Amino acid sequence: EWVPLPGSLEAIALLNQAGYQIAIATNQSGLSRGYFTIDDLHAMHSKMERLLQPLGGKIDSIFFCPHTDAHACDCRKPAPGLMKEIALRYKKTNSNQPLLGVPIVGDSLRDLEAGIALGASPHLVLTGKGQKTMAKGNLPDGTQIHADLMAFTSTLLKTQA
């Protein structure tokens, strides 16, 4: 069952209220492995949306890869396929780096690599797998590190003010 990290829903709502659109790109190999069904995944997404609504937040789009590493797909992060789909959805198709300057926030190197392939600005959060990711090193140049999604949001909104 999906449980939100403390402060994450509030951070998303603050981003929405500041005019940001939120897109999620997620690897969901559990679908291919039979750990859960597409209906289960949609139920998790619906729960997220339901919990965000009273806070004034929303997820604008969710893109997921159902494949395992064994599949030779372009959508499983760190491949940039999901990010390309996001760029197309938001009509950012005018260059080889359609997400130039757009923040990519994640807790894994895979997340960051998928975004920087299209020019996104990498932001590592230390929740989830973030601590292990930071300890391994090899973060992309320019990666900013934040305690959690709320810390990222606070930093972003301060720099935009």
List where the protein language model places each region.
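Asp-based, Mg2+/Mn2+-dependent phosphohydrolase catalytic module
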Residues: 38-60, 69-104, 108-161
